[in-house]
């Protein structure tokens, strides 16, 4: 099992977490775990003062290679000291499938968090196992190999949407095949919903439900409301969230709308509404706050229940 970094979120890791990981490794003594630390974790710190099982192999800031039947797996932790020099002596074993694991963002320069992809081409790498990006992706490296981010096993926020899982590598007769295997028990989805012109929460709710059709009920959904909204519209995020919260495991609703309002329409309006809107538009409040203030004020002027 190749773990290409970021198993932890930081250097400070609870002892209980470390113990559970090491216990899991010990329960499968016939499986080797090859762990390369990422930019969010520190192997030396995390496993300090712990007895490391023999089947947990830790990469360091120097190249190391672990050989198996027909496969050689090499890796190195990128740091300031080796960010440029590591490309000069990339390990390669003749007659076997060569896998290299690194952690960082692929790019065109050599840095602590950036992997210089061009310097890895034509080095006999059949598969470049990468960590850092939490979404699965794969691209050709050169004529002989590919590079691949396996992503994470479970999405941890709405910035990590889509299928999550691991990559299964199969090596037979000197040939490597790879397959993405979905693993997460649920997915996260960000659903944009343009509510321009809608003034009623019931209409907005119907459009949200239509936009989320086909998403399994066990998944998590974040609705992003956008578009221009009339100042008299009674947009109540809490109401909308309650309207759809039973449809999915978790629901969030974000108001990213803007006021569909033309200041010229209220320039000569002598009503209380006109005076109120002019005062708010001329204030130093942010556009987001102006929209919220005007919406709340309109509710108050019309004698409606104020929703915040």
Go through each PLM region and give its residues:
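N-terminal active-site segment of His-dependent metallophosphoesterases
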Residues: 1-20, 94, 290-308
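Divalent metal-dependent hydrolysis catalytic cores, especially in the metallo-beta-lactamase
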Residues: 2-6, 12-13, 34, 221-222, ...
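His/Asp/Glu-rich metal-coordinating catalytic cores
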Residues: 9-148, 152-157, 161-165, 170
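Accessory, non-catalytic peripheral segments of nucleic-acid enzymes
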Residues: 173-308
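Short active-site-proximal "capping" loops at secondary-structure junctions
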Residues: 7-9, 41, 228, 258
């Amino acid at each position: 099992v190749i773990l290409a970094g970021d198993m932890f979120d930081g250097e400070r890791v609870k002892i209980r977490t470390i113990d559970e990981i090491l216990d899991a490794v010990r329960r499968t003594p016939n499986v080797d775990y090859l762990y390369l630390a990422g930019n969010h974790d520190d192997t030396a710190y995390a496993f300090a003062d712990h007895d490391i099982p023999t089947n947990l192999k830790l990469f360091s800031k120097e190249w190391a290679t672990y050989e198996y039947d027909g496969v050689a797996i090499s890796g190195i932790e990128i740091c300031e000291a080796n960010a440029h020099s590591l490309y000069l002596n990339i390990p390669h074993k003749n007659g076997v499938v060569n896998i290299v694991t690194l952690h960082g963002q692929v790019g065109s320069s050599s840095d602590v968090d950036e992997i210089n992809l061009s310097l890895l081409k034509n080095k006999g790498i059949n598969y470049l196992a990468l960590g850092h990006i939490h979404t699965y992706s794969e691209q050709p490296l050169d004529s002989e190999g590919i590079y691949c981010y396996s992503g994470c096993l479970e999405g941890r926020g709405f910035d990590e949407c889509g299928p999550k899982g691991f990559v299964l590598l199969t090596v037979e007769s000197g040939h490597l095949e790879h397959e993405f295997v979905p693993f997460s028990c649920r997915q996260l989805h960000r659903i944009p919903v343009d509510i321009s012109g809608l003034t009623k929460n019931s209409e907005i709710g119907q459009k949200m439900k239509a936009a989320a059709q086909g998403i399994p009920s066990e998944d998590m959904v974040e609705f992003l409301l956008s578009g221009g909204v009339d100042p008299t519209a009674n947009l109540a995020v809490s109401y909308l969230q309650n309207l759809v919260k039973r449809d999915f495991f978790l629901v969030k609703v974000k108001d990213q709308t803007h006021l569909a309002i033309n200041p010229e329409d209220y320039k000569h309006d002598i009503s209380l509404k006109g005076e109120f809107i002019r005062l708010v538009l001329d204030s130093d409040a942010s556009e987001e706050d102006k929209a919220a203030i005007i919406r709340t004020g309109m509710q108050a002027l019309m004698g409606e229940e104020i929703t915040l």
